[in-house]
């Protein structure tokens, strides 16, 4: 019956599943997948302090474990993975907006070349052997107008074309392209529906069909061959809606709503399943350890 109702409403069928919660609830975290495991990095704690904690979730065993703490406590940082290494870039610390680049391999953090300029509340994605940092802010309230690309073989940063400036956006790689999804210009009344893509090496971003609903403080991931946009916050509170974009269509389709609406959340994809972990259940400084996943199909 539920599947029929969802189909009639233009919602793709699927059922959210709950996993064991993040051991320490946080919001404004960074997340990435390394070797089939999900790494959750930093974020705000319930008391407003930033965290350096790194927790690792195995969907196969449904268990959490600790990884070495990040060398600095951060919130609004960006994370991505490539060939068994976790990269954590930028974010806010007690000293301001960071330029830092850290890589974790063999349970040891290594500090790499810093970004050309500070970044926080941006999106991160890996495509064509480069880690892209798109959007975000140079410092609180100052939108970034260019993006950065980190060559993962030469370990060097370059400046590349940026998407339309906005912060608290999401980024993901799909089909060899980098996508910049939604975000906002400042406060939660400035949320955007804008979605753009970049082909590595191109000099400009291309607009793709916009999201059906604006959102900031959102997350996105590639799963099941589609780009999945999850959650966020707006003037009415946290956002439950979930949409999937098929580049071959090209159009957005509605998926089942997120059971625990959140902003500042980690969204990652493993195969056809999207995982949504941590975040704030209400706008502002509220924390959650929720761990929910959805099979979006192939």
Where do the model's predicted regions map?
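Kelch-like beta-propeller repeat domains
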Residues: 6-298
